[in-house]
Design a protein with these regions (language model features):
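Alpha-helical and His/Cys-centered functional microenvironments
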Residues: 88, 100, 157, 322-325
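Hydrophobic membrane-insertion alpha-helices, especially the h-region
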Residues: 14-18
Length: 339
């Protein structure tokens, strides 16, 4: 009995200390997030001024939700919808908005559902690709347009692929940046050990609570690690840029909602089933030094496309529209000018 007592007492003390430290750590993270989120409105106006072009923030109703959306450019211009990825927000496109407006486009940049200031419905099922694509369809229609040029990066690119396949009537042209076409992604996950290793985080994101607390404990440090560690040019993100991204992470219920995109994808195979050829003119831009998505994901795509152009940007990491904005913008605008 004494032997068990000698074991149980230190074990109980250690377990109690661990529980206390865990609770303190979680509570500290919640306080950090609350402090950041409290300044959101003022920060949004500061971010809008960074665009150096007339733009407004508004909430647009789609499918029973409200999407916080940045709108700029002439009312009668062709519509361009820019879709951010994980863990970004509308501000990820800050370096593309002005060039597109100056080229005559009506530019619409939503925080997608679950992100930043947009609504965050509870439940993993609310983040399936079908729902995410339906948001974009309704957004285009609510603005009085029948179709749009759709530009997507990362998970925004996955929504763009799904939109072009299942709602082709609303997509005039398609531009995707560092988001694998689903058939290529499935092929590489099955046959390429290097890509499986790079995709480890997708499995980690299936865990409950842990990813939220890891990213949310110190949102500014999380933003710094996420955006600068997969960037060749460390000057691509200023301290202000990281503060905007961190504030998006800190919004109430945002982290769970953002991670639910990955959880929904793992529970349903909609992204990898019912694949259809894409008829619209398509530009796929790829950063050569993306640490999480290998260049082999751009190989063997021709059978799935009627009109595909692939443009690779050397010495560039995953956040290409931030790291190489001049080349991205030149290639984007040149593609849009093509008949």
């Amino acid at each position: 009995m004494a032997r068990w007592r000698n074991f149980l007492i230190p074990f109980s003390l250690a377990a109690g200390a661990a529980a206390f430290l865990t609770a303190w750590w979680i509570q500290r993270g919640r306080a950090n997030r609350s402090a950041l989120a409290s300044n959101t409105e003022a920060l949004t106006w500061q971010a809008l001024r960074q665009l150096d072009v007339a733009a407004e923030a508004r909430f647009i109703a789609v499918n029973g939700l409200e999407l916080h959306t940045i709108v700029a450019g002439p009312l009668d211009g062709p519509l361009a919808v820019l879709l951010h990825g994980f863990p970004e927000c509308w501000y990820a496109w800050r370096k593309q908005i002005k060039p597109l407006v100056e080229a005559g486009y009506r530019v619409v940049v939503p925080d997608q559902r679950g992100y930043n200031l947009s609504d965050k419905p509870r439940g993993i099922h609310n983040y399936r690709l079908e729902a995410l694509s339906a948001d974009v369809v309704e957004l285009i229609r609510s603005l009085g347009h029948e179709k749009a040029i759709v530009v997507g990066h990362d998970l925004g690119g996955m929504v763009s692929w799904h939109l072009a396949m299942h709602h082709p009537q609303v997509v005039e042209k398609l531009i995707v940046m560092n988001a694998p076409y689903p058939a290529a992604f499935l092929r590489e996950l099955r046959s390429n050990p290097a890509q499986r290793r790079k995709s480890w985080y997708m499995g980690f994101f299936q865990l409950p609570i842990v990813p939220e607390e890891l990213f949310g404990h110190d949102p500014i440090e999380s933003a710094r690690r996420i955006f600068r560690q997969n960037t060749i040019n460390q000057d691509a993100f200023s301290s202000f840029d990281l503060h905007v991204m961190a504030t998006a992470l800190a919004q109430p219920n945002a982290l769970t909602s953002m991670l639910n995109w990955y959880r929904a994808a793992a529970r349903g195979r909609s992204a990898l089933e019912n694949l259809r050829p894409i008829e619209q003119p398509t530009l796929l831009m790829w950063a050569e030094d993306d640490a999480v998505l290998g260049r082999s994901l751009t190989y063997g795509l021709e059978p799935w496309f009627s009109n595909l152009k692939i443009h690779t940007i050397p010495h560039c990491g995953h956040w290409m529209q931030n790291e190489a904005p001049r080349e991205v913008n030149e290639e984007l605008l040149a593609f849009l000018k093509m008949a």
